[in-house]
Amino acid sequence: MTDWRFYIMDKRYAVLIDADNVSEKYIKPILDEISNEGVITYKRIYGDWTRPALASWKQALLNHSITPIQQYSYTTGKNSTDSAMIIDAMDILYSHNVDGFCIVSSDGDFTRLAARLRESGMHVVGMGEKKTPNPFIAACNRFVYLENLAQGEVSDTAEQDKDKSDDEVHEVVKTKTIKNA
Protein backbone atom coordinates (compact mmCIF):
# COMPACT_ATOMS: atom_id res chain seq x y z
CA MET A 1 0.00 0.00 0.00
CA THR A 2 1.28 3.49 -0.85
CA ASP A 3 2.04 5.77 2.07
CA TRP A 4 0.72 9.12 0.82
CA ARG A 5 2.40 11.07 3.65
CA PHE A 6 5.67 10.98 1.71
CA TYR A 7 4.07 12.63 -1.29
CA ILE A 8 2.34 15.31 0.75
CA MET A 9 5.54 16.21 2.61
CA ASP A 10 7.59 16.85 -0.54
CA LYS A 11 7.82 20.51 -1.44
CA ARG A 12 7.03 21.36 -5.05
CA TYR A 13 9.45 23.65 -6.86
CA ALA A 14 9.41 25.65 -10.05
CA VAL A 15 12.87 25.84 -11.63
CA LEU A 16 13.24 28.93 -13.82
CA ILE A 17 16.51 29.32 -15.72
CA ASP A 18 17.87 32.43 -17.44
CA ALA A 19 19.67 30.94 -20.47
CA ASP A 20 21.35 34.27 -21.19
CA ASN A 21 23.26 34.09 -17.89
CA VAL A 22 23.83 30.37 -17.27
CA SER A 23 25.83 27.75 -19.16
CA GLU A 24 24.28 24.42 -20.15
CA LYS A 25 27.13 22.60 -18.38
CA TYR A 26 25.39 23.35 -15.07
CA ILE A 27 22.00 21.83 -15.87
CA LYS A 28 22.45 18.38 -14.30
CA PRO A 29 23.95 19.72 -11.05
CA ILE A 30 21.16 22.33 -10.86
CA LEU A 31 18.41 19.73 -11.17
CA ASP A 32 20.16 17.30 -8.81
CA GLU A 33 20.58 20.02 -6.19
CA ILE A 34 17.01 21.28 -6.24
CA SER A 35 15.75 17.67 -6.19
CA ASN A 36 17.24 17.52 -2.69
CA GLU A 37 14.75 20.24 -1.72
CA GLY A 38 11.65 18.57 -3.15
CA VAL A 39 9.86 17.64 -6.35
CA ILE A 40 10.43 19.73 -9.48
CA THR A 41 7.04 20.46 -11.02
CA TYR A 42 8.05 23.17 -13.49
CA LYS A 43 11.29 23.17 -15.51
CA ARG A 44 11.48 26.20 -17.78
CA ILE A 45 14.33 28.01 -19.44
CA TYR A 46 14.09 31.45 -21.04
CA GLY A 47 15.99 32.90 -23.95
CA ASP A 48 15.99 33.94 -27.58
CA TRP A 49 16.44 30.47 -29.07
CA THR A 50 17.06 31.94 -32.54
CA ARG A 51 20.45 33.19 -31.30
CA PRO A 52 23.37 30.89 -32.20
CA ALA A 53 24.83 31.39 -28.71
CA LEU A 54 22.00 29.28 -27.23
CA ALA A 55 22.23 26.40 -29.72
CA SER A 56 24.42 24.43 -27.31
CA TRP A 57 21.45 24.10 -24.93
CA LYS A 58 19.40 21.87 -27.26
CA GLN A 59 20.62 18.45 -26.11
CA ALA A 60 20.52 19.38 -22.42
CA LEU A 61 16.90 20.51 -22.78
CA LEU A 62 15.94 17.25 -24.46
CA ASN A 63 17.83 15.09 -21.96
CA HIS A 64 16.23 16.76 -18.94
CA SER A 65 12.75 17.52 -20.32
CA ILE A 66 13.08 21.26 -19.81
CA THR A 67 10.57 23.50 -21.56
CA PRO A 68 12.27 26.27 -23.55
CA ILE A 69 10.39 29.56 -23.53
CA GLN A 70 11.08 31.64 -26.62
CA GLN A 71 11.51 35.34 -26.00
CA TYR A 72 12.70 37.43 -28.94
CA SER A 73 15.04 40.34 -28.30
CA TYR A 74 12.84 43.17 -29.56
CA THR A 75 15.23 46.00 -28.71
CA THR A 76 18.99 46.15 -28.38
CA GLY A 77 20.11 46.66 -24.80
CA LYS A 78 16.83 45.54 -23.22
CA ASN A 79 16.45 42.11 -21.69
CA SER A 80 13.00 40.84 -22.63
CA THR A 81 14.00 37.38 -21.38
CA ASP A 82 14.02 38.69 -17.80
CA SER A 83 10.53 40.14 -18.23
CA ALA A 84 9.14 36.86 -19.56
CA MET A 85 10.68 34.93 -16.67
CA ILE A 86 9.27 37.34 -14.08
CA ILE A 87 5.77 37.22 -15.60
CA ASP A 88 5.85 33.40 -15.65
CA ALA A 89 7.04 33.31 -12.03
CA MET A 90 4.10 35.45 -10.94
CA ASP A 91 1.66 33.30 -12.94
CA ILE A 92 3.06 30.17 -11.26
CA LEU A 93 2.90 31.86 -7.85
CA TYR A 94 -0.79 32.65 -8.26
CA SER A 95 -1.56 29.14 -9.54
CA HIS A 96 -0.78 27.87 -6.01
CA ASN A 97 0.87 24.78 -7.53
CA VAL A 98 4.30 25.19 -5.90
CA ASP A 99 5.84 25.65 -2.47
CA GLY A 100 9.05 27.22 -3.71
CA PHE A 101 11.08 28.55 -6.60
CA CYS A 102 14.58 27.99 -7.86
CA ILE A 103 15.76 31.03 -9.81
CA VAL A 104 18.88 30.25 -11.80
CA SER A 105 20.70 33.37 -12.96
CA SER A 106 23.73 35.47 -12.15
CA ASP A 107 21.68 38.56 -12.96
CA GLY A 108 20.81 40.99 -10.17
CA ASP A 109 17.62 41.97 -12.03
CA PHE A 110 15.87 39.07 -10.27
CA THR A 111 16.43 40.54 -6.80
CA ARG A 112 12.96 42.06 -6.55
CA LEU A 113 11.35 38.87 -7.89
CA ALA A 114 13.04 36.76 -5.20
CA ALA A 115 11.98 39.22 -2.51
CA ARG A 116 8.39 39.28 -3.78
CA LEU A 117 8.16 35.49 -3.87
CA ARG A 118 9.40 35.31 -0.29
CA GLU A 119 6.82 37.92 0.76
CA SER A 120 4.21 35.47 -0.55
CA GLY A 121 5.56 32.68 1.64
CA MET A 122 7.56 30.90 -1.02
CA HIS A 123 10.92 29.29 -0.29
CA VAL A 124 13.39 30.74 -2.81
CA VAL A 125 16.60 28.99 -3.77
CA GLY A 126 18.88 31.08 -5.95
CA MET A 127 21.65 29.62 -8.05
CA GLY A 128 24.26 31.54 -9.98
CA GLU A 129 27.93 32.04 -10.62
CA LYS A 130 30.23 33.74 -8.14
CA LYS A 131 29.78 37.02 -10.04
CA THR A 132 26.14 37.19 -8.85
CA PRO A 133 25.38 40.53 -7.14
CA ASN A 134 24.99 40.40 -3.36
CA PRO A 135 21.45 41.89 -3.32
CA PHE A 136 20.13 38.90 -5.32
CA ILE A 137 21.94 36.48 -3.02
CA ALA A 138 20.47 38.22 0.04
CA ALA A 139 16.95 38.15 -1.42
CA CYS A 140 16.94 34.34 -1.56
CA ASN A 141 16.35 31.99 1.37
CA ARG A 142 19.37 30.08 0.16
CA PHE A 143 21.89 30.67 -2.60
CA VAL A 144 24.15 28.09 -4.26
CA TYR A 145 27.19 28.86 -6.42
CA LEU A 146 27.09 26.93 -9.70
CA GLU A 147 30.85 26.60 -10.09
CA ASN A 148 31.01 24.41 -7.00
CA LEU A 149 28.05 22.25 -8.01
CA ALA A 150 29.53 21.56 -11.44
CA GLN A 151 32.82 20.44 -9.92
CA GLY A 152 31.08 18.18 -7.43
CA GLU A 153 32.70 20.07 -4.56
CA VAL A 154 31.18 21.04 -1.28
CA SER A 155 28.81 23.85 -2.21
CA ASP A 156 29.20 27.44 -1.17
CA THR A 157 25.89 28.68 0.09
CA ALA A 158 24.79 32.05 1.26
CA GLU A 159 21.95 31.46 3.65
CA GLN A 160 19.49 33.92 5.07
CA ASP A 161 17.03 33.35 7.87
CA LYS A 162 13.70 35.15 7.52
CA ASP A 163 13.96 36.15 11.19
CA LYS A 164 17.34 37.89 10.82
CA SER A 165 17.39 41.65 10.71
CA ASP A 166 18.51 43.49 7.59
CA ASP A 167 21.51 44.82 9.51
CA GLU A 168 23.08 41.39 9.93
CA VAL A 169 25.91 40.42 7.64
CA HIS A 170 25.18 37.46 5.36
CA GLU A 171 28.28 35.34 5.02
CA VAL A 172 29.17 32.81 2.36
CA VAL A 173 29.99 29.61 4.19
CA LYS A 174 31.28 26.16 3.34
CA THR A 175 28.86 23.44 4.29
CA LYS A 176 28.61 19.72 3.71
CA THR A 177 24.83 19.71 3.86
CA ILE A 178 23.14 22.35 1.78
CA LYS A 179 19.56 21.18 2.20
CA ASN A 180 17.39 23.47 4.33
CA ALA A 181 14.04 22.66 5.85
Task: Describe the residue ranges of each PLM region.
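Conserved acidic residues
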Residues: 13, 99, 141
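Acidic beta-strand-to-loop metal/phosphate-binding motif
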Residues: 46, 99-106, 113, 117, ...
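N-terminal regulatory modules in eukaryotic regulatory proteins
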Residues: 159-181
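Intrinsically disordered, low-complexity glycine/proline-rich and charged
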Residues: 115-156
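A polyampholytic, Gly/Pro-enriched intrinsically disordered region
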Residues: 91-97, 146-154, 161
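Conserved nucleotide-binding/hydrolysis micro-motifs of P-loop NTPases
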Residues: 21-23, 49-52, 108-110, 131-132, ...
